[in-house]
């Protein structure tokens, strides 16, 4: 992802480790394109899925299984292994690198995410039983609201950069 001011790029690398679980480890970096300095945001995590900047560039929205980020998204009894495809959302504050699990107690699996520049809300799709539903989350308090959609399977969403307009199918 590229920050809205164009100065920073989020990039991930991965390496294989076939001798133990997880077998692939990913590292997330923030690159300053003016100085070419990199900063490691997440090192060798086996369950991290993706990352995008907040509209103001002060936070990063991370997605991954409940086991990513040292398991801060886990909500199962000790000894149980969560579904690796049950993607959750986490928000990292770039100033202090603190990470908050935003969907730890949210049961549908997160799929596509869009952090909207106009209203600052995070819009996302999630597997909801046999449906793929549309949701909105307030990143400041974690409140999630299911949005009414005319489709049972919302496969993709897109939002205008400077207007309160969304398209989905």
Regions from the PLM with identified roles:
Residues 9, 57-60, 121-122, 164-166:
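Hydrophobic beta-strand positions that form the internal "hydrophobic ladder"
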């Amino acid at each position: 992802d590229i920050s809205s001011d164009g100065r920073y790029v989020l990039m991930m690398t991965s390496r294989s480790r076939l001798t133990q679980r997880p077998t692939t480890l990913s590292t997330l970096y923030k690159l300053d394109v003016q100085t070419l300095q990199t900063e490691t945001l997440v090192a060798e995590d086996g369950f991290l899925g993706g990352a995008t900047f907040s509209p103001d560039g002060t936070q990063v929205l991370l997605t991954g299984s409940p086991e990513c980020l040292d398991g801060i998204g886990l909500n199962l009894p000790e000894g149980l292994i969560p579904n690796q495809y049950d993607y959750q959302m986490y928000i990292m504050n770039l100033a202090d690198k603190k990470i908050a699990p935003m969907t730890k107690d949210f049961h549908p699996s997160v799929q596509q995410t869009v952090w909207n520049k106009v209203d600052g809300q995070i819009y996302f799709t999630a597997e909801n039983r046999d449906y793929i539903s549309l949701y909105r989350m307030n990143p400041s308090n974690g409140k999630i609201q299911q949005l009414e959609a005319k489709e049972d399977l919302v496969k993709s969403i897109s939002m205008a950069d400077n207007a309160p307009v969304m398209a989905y199918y």
